[in-house]
Swiss-Prot record:
Keyword line: Cytoplasm, Endonuclease, Hydrolase, Manganese, Metal-binding, Nuclease
Root EC class: hydrolase
GO terms of molecular function: manganese ion binding; RNA binding; RNA-DNA hybrid ribonuclease activity
RNase H type-2 domain residues: 20-209
EC number: 3.1.26.4
Broad class of where this protein is predominantly found: cytoplasm
Protein name: Ribonuclease HII
Keyword Ribosomal protein: no
Length: 212
């Protein structure tokens, strides 16, 4: 099985087309039952690219933390979120795209080309974009964005766990693990749970149906 590592090929191609501010964009947190969806936009500079960049899911938590700190030092970084309320109102796909747009808008330099993880380019970004399937494993800028987004969201979930103990958010990051689902049944949903997601919705419906 061939092991792929992200490289600078996609950035080089965009720069060769005449674009001058090329950034990578990725999001994390589409699947969890709780917490925001978080996106990051990162502009890397040749000669200052941290070693070891890869899809955040392939890295240990300590390694992600180290790389995120380095990325913040050597690159232009913007992190943005879409709230649980926005996820429930819009749907998770549209909320993810909203977070991506906010991340792009928050960069100190205005990008003229965005490399986006996935198969779909969000509408209305106001930038030239290219979607790259598995981009976080193929493109260095997207890999960097995946790392800083993951670290930022994990920190949010650790903070939320202190406010709402018992759901295991420090370790499950809001995903629907067995322990998290059991806690939902025992403790009920919090304001940070996504009511539009089926496991949470079902518990709320069950509670409503048995209430006096």
């Amino acid at each position: 099985m061939e092991i792929t590592c992200p490289d600078w090929t996609h950035e080089t191609a965009a720069l060769a087309e005449g674009f001058t501010c090329v950034v990578g964009v990725d999001e994390v947190g589409r699947g969890p039952l709780a917490g925001p969806v978080t996106a990051a936009a990162v502009r890397l500079f040749p000669g200052r690219i941290p070693e070891g960049l890869n899809d955040s899911k392939k890295l240990t938590a300590p390694r992600r933390e180290m790389l995120a700190a380095e990325i913040h030092t050597v690159a232009e970084v913007s992190i943005a979120h879409a709230s649980v309320e926005e996820i429930d109102r819009l749907n998770i796909l549209q909320a993810s795209h909203l977070a991506m747009g906010r991340a792009l808008a928050g960069l100190p330099s205005r990008p003229d080309f965005a490399l986006i993880d996935g198969h779909m380019v969000p509408k209305g970004l106001g930038h030239r974009c290219r979607a790259i399937v598995k981009g976080d494993a193929l493109c260095l800028s997207i890999a960097a964005a995946s790392i800083v987004a993951k670290v930022a969201r994990d920190r949010i979930m650790v903070d939320l766990e202190q406010q709402h103990p018992g759901y295991g958010w420090r370790t499950n990051a809001g995903y629907g693990t067995k322990d998290h689902l059991q806690a939902l049944l025992n403790l009920g949903p919090t304001p940070h749970h996504r009511r539009s997601f089926k496991p949470v919705h079902n518990i709320l419906y069950q509670e409503a149906s048995i209430s006096p």
